[in-house]
Amino acid sequence: METLQTWSGRFKRFFLDNKFVLFLLVLLLIGLNILVFTKTSFIFTPIIVLLKTISLPIILTGIVFYLLNPVVDFLERRRIRRIYSILLLYLLVIGLITITIVSIIPFLKEQIMSLIDNIPRYVDVVENQTKQLIGSNFVNQAQQTMNINISDLATKVSDQAATIVNSTFTGVGNFIGALTEIIISIVTVPFILFYLLKDGRKLPVYILKFVPTRLKEQTYTVLSEMNHRLSSYIRGQIIVSFCIGFLLFIGYLIIGLDYASLLAVIAACTSIVPYLGPTIAITPAIIIAIVTSPLMLLKLVIVWTIVQLIEGKLISPQIMGKNLHIHPITIIFLLLTAGKLFGVVGIILAIPGYAVAKVITTHLFDWFKMQSHLYDEEKNENTPGHKV
């Protein structure tokens, strides 16, 4: 028995207390996982199809759950039974949606139709400005210097435009399929949300039933931290996006920018995605401002700068704080990579997914430090009474 324990201890020290061996072991495990996945990817096809089917309803349900659950908890603390609180909240939400559809949607529809009607005028303005630019000495000099043939360039642009139009018609079927999926998801969300609001608190207890007794406390800590990170991010990001949309709406009204309501709604929706969202949001506003006048473009830049300063210095620090502890460069790389791999869904899930993975990885690394002797010096430094 002692011999077995001795060999077990040597084996453990060999893998856990040797940085080089541990590094090779991690590389080996990663390589094996990649190899197995590439050779058996067909096995995961049904799972991927299932995940694609249920991902959108689950994402929408999770977002709405984190928004409404604090309200249900508040009503329950006021001695209103939870199921009655949920039903009351459903009635309020249905009322708000009805008011929005009746009052706001027609106004936005009017602005959208007006924008569509004015597109030919905008095209004419851009075309005239382009002709003036092409006829200027600056462009002629640039053409001679860079050896660019404007006619050939226009022909290539025309051919590319025709290709885009053809691909657009080809993608109509895909658009209809995606629209059907969205409608089905919206219909199923209220039912999933009801049971999640009603029994969501029992979910950690149910998960802990499958966890060994000695790991229950640590697992519960991990689940609680994951829940805190997700709830803080989702609620905070939506509130910040709403504030940005409202501030831009006020600013657009002050400077007299056309389609202020529509542009503010676009800004509020896209601002859910950090860093990249504001860039997408300002693009249509810049186009309309350029077509209007150079002075309007200057006013737009001033309004946008003021709103970004208010958001960065006042709103986000108060609402978001430093809950996720993710560096801005990391966020940008996450958004670019997830967008390339998984599209819009990847952009939306990149940051909360990374936050969850970071919580799990941090706790696993803490467990490893407790098991390994590689970090004994660090543990001694963190011990109470240790003097530096």
UniProtKB/Swiss-Prot annotation:
Sorted alphabetically, the keyword list is: Cell membrane, Membrane, Transmembrane, Transmembrane helix, Transport
Assigned GO CC terms: plasma membrane
| Family annotation (InterPro entries) | AI-2E-like (IPR002549)
Q: Where in the cell is it found?
A: Cell membrane
Membrane spanning residue stretches: 20-40, 47-67, 86-106, 175-195, 237-257, 262-282, 286-306, 331-351
Q: How does it sit in the membrane?
A: Multi-pass membrane protein
Q: Does the keyword Cell wall biogenesis/degradation apply?
A: no
**Pfam family of the protein (one):** AI-2E_transport
Chaperone recorded as keyword: no
Q: Which GO terms describe its biological process?
A: transmembrane transport
Family (UniProt)? Belongs to the autoinducer-2 exporter (AI-2E) (TC 2.A.86) family.
PANTHER family recorded: TRANSMEMBRANE PROTEIN, TRANSPORT PROTEIN YUBA-RELATED
List the protein's name.
Putative transport protein YubA
